[in-house]
A protein has these predicted regions:
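N-terminal pre-domain/capping segments
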Residues: 1-104
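Active-site groove signature of glycoside hydrolases
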Residues: 97-117
Length: 117
């Protein structure tokens, strides 16, 4: 069995997280927040640092996860300001996934509206 962890569930300090992963035999890293930024908000040099740390420590990235579309509602439409903001974030996360070798990008579902009959 191969085990991994959502890294910021341990700490947003990725180096510390990798130490804990080694201690408990966790192989795969799912990234959501690293430092003070959500994936997709890191600049190119920060992404290189993240990638280098994980590769040097033998921790493949299993998934990048961002709260894309969380908070949108049925009132939001493709092309509106909020939808465009989320789509731009998704593009940045996909670019980061290519760099760190992540096979998956996980997004969230829109806000569920209560339906009353």
């Amino acid at each position: 069995m191969k085990l991994g962890v959502i890294c910021d569930g341990i700490s947003r300090d990725l180096s510390h997280t990798v130490d804990v992963m080694d201690e408990f035999g966790l192989e795969y890293a799912e990234l959501q927040f690293v430092g003070e930024k959500e994936v997709g908000d890191h600049d190119a040099s920060e992404i290189r640092e993240i990638d280098l740390l994980l590769r040097d420590r033998g921790k493949p990235v299993s998934c990048l996860s961002r709260h894309i579309f969380a908070g949108t509602t049925i009132a939001n439409r493709p092309g509106d300001e909020l939808h465009t903001k989320h789509m731009d974030a998704l593009k940045r996360v996909i670019e980061m996934a290519h760099i760190v070798g992540s096979p998956l990008v996980r997004i969230m579902t829109p806000k569920k509206e209560q339906i009353l009959f």
